[in-house]
């Protein structure tokens, strides 16, 4: 059985993945006051800010690195398997945050998250090109991009 307008359901699922992607990304900044008290109770305010900055920088550089990696992965394995891989790895990385014991483990988990979450954008762009004719791509792009604003 073929679903009518399947491409619109695909782009909606990508938008939902984008919402989750951005919630994961922003959650550290929201939870940092509690995390820092738990992991670094003896550090000064300045040292805590520096730790946060270092962890955030690791995430950003990992995300940038992941863009190129996942661009190639999506071209190699296709969009379906590429999304399974990206979302699977970022889900595991998110869960691993609960086991962080310090700056090194938290940085590693954030870096893995950054690399994996980076797959969302190349995958979304490739899906858009595969599923939508040229005259509908801008709308589809707008729908999945709205996930970033919501998340």
Question: Where are the regions a protein language model picked out?
Answer:
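Extracellular/periplasmic helix-loop-helix junction of adjacent transmembrane segments
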Residues: 32-65
């Amino acid at each position: 059985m073929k679903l009518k307008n399947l491409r619109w359901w695909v782009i909606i699922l990508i938008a939902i993945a984008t919402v989750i992607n951005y919630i994961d990304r922003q959650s550290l900044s929201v939870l940092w006051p509690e995390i820092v008290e738990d992991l670094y109770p003896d550090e000064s305010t300045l040292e805590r800010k520096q730790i946060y900055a270092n962890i955030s920088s690791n995430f950003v550089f990992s995300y940038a690195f992941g863009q190129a990696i996942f661009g190639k992965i999506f071209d190699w394995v296709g969009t379906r398997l590429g999304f399974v891989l990206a979302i699977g790895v970022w889900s595991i990385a998110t869960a691993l945050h609960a086991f962080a014991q310090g700056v090194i483990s938290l940085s590693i988990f954030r870096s893995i998250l950054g690399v994996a979450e980076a797959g969302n954008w190349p995958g979304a762009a490739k899906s858009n090109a595969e599923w939508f004719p040229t005259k509908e791509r801008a709308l589809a792009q707008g729908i999945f991009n709205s996930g970033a604003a919501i998340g």
